[in-house]
Amino acid sequence: MSDYQKGLLITFFGVLFVTPDSLFVRLISSDGLTIAFWRSFSAGILILVALVAFTGLRNIKSLFLMGKLGWLYCFLIGSTSPAFVCAVENTSVANVVFIFAAMPIFASLFSYFILKEPIPKRVKKTIIIVTLGLIIIAYGSTENETSNWIGDLFAFYVCVSYAAALTLIRKLKSISILPALPVAYLGSAMILFFFTEPFIGFERNADLYLIHGFFIAVGTCFLAIGPRYITSPEASLLILLETILAPLLVWVILYEYPGMWSIAGGAMVVLALSISNLYAFNKVKRGSKKETS
């Protein structure tokens, strides 16, 4: 199997593993901060065990080399865990993932300011359409019982934080960022521990906590590894699968209808990003053909 095929498979399975994330939050019968604690703690422990098992302690030195930007990455990733749970608890799953779909747009903006990369005209046009889609989603939150603008704001924070974190990974590309993941998740769990009672009702939800953490750990690691072997447009297209699959999963299992405004705004976001990424993918493909000819 080539590195390219490996990258496609790893990224695809990474998307599949993170897709049920919002469903687990809905299924676990506990308060949001407790869910966030166990989500962070179990994912952090599992990633740490996997890192030690497969690479030993040699990657630990990355923690001492990543500097302020690396610790900022840890903060951003760690803070998204409670913010994600708060988002899912306060608005529809469809709203959350549709807002997440705008992540490449914010990543482009951060790349412009941090990496000094120019924003192509194609991306500028996409930003306008995606912004209109997000406005429609926000409006729908005032018209729908399952949606709320507070949850939308939490989802927006997670979207912006992940986009910033992805940009920092590119800034620190000479350093392995995987050891920072357990630090981020376990650091988040440590702080959340003082704001919740995580062992109340633990027996009732123990299985779901562990499975939830396993899915997050595997999905996070796969999405940190897979995109290194494929182009950014291909990675973006694969990650968009979650935007379609997650609300469908919750709709089928929990009968959560997102509302027409959310569907309309989300469709605008997904369609704009799909066209933009397909154009970029074809451009990269044409470029590679010219090089080989």
Task: Give, region by region, the residue ranges found by the protein language model.
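Hydrophobic transmembrane alpha-helices of multi-pass small-molecule transport proteins
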Residues: 47, 51, 77, 122-141, ...
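Hydrophobic/small/kink-forming positions within alpha-helical transmembrane segments
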Residues: 19, 74, 78-82, 104-109, ...
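Loop-to-transmembrane-helix transition segments
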Residues: 6-14, 58-83, 149-158, 193, ...
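Helix-helix packing/entry segments at the starts of transmembrane helices
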Residues: 96-102, 169-187, 217-252
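C-terminal transmembrane-helix exit sites in multi-pass transporters
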Residues: 84-86, 103-125, 244-264
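C-terminal-most transmembrane helix of multi-pass membrane proteins
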Residues: 40, 51, 139, 240-293
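Glycine-/small-residue-enriched transmembrane alpha-helix faces in small-molecule transporters
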Residues: 1-37, 41, 75, 83, ...
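Transmembrane alpha-helices of multi-pass small-molecule transport proteins
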Residues: 30-79, 106-107, 161-165, 182-198, ...
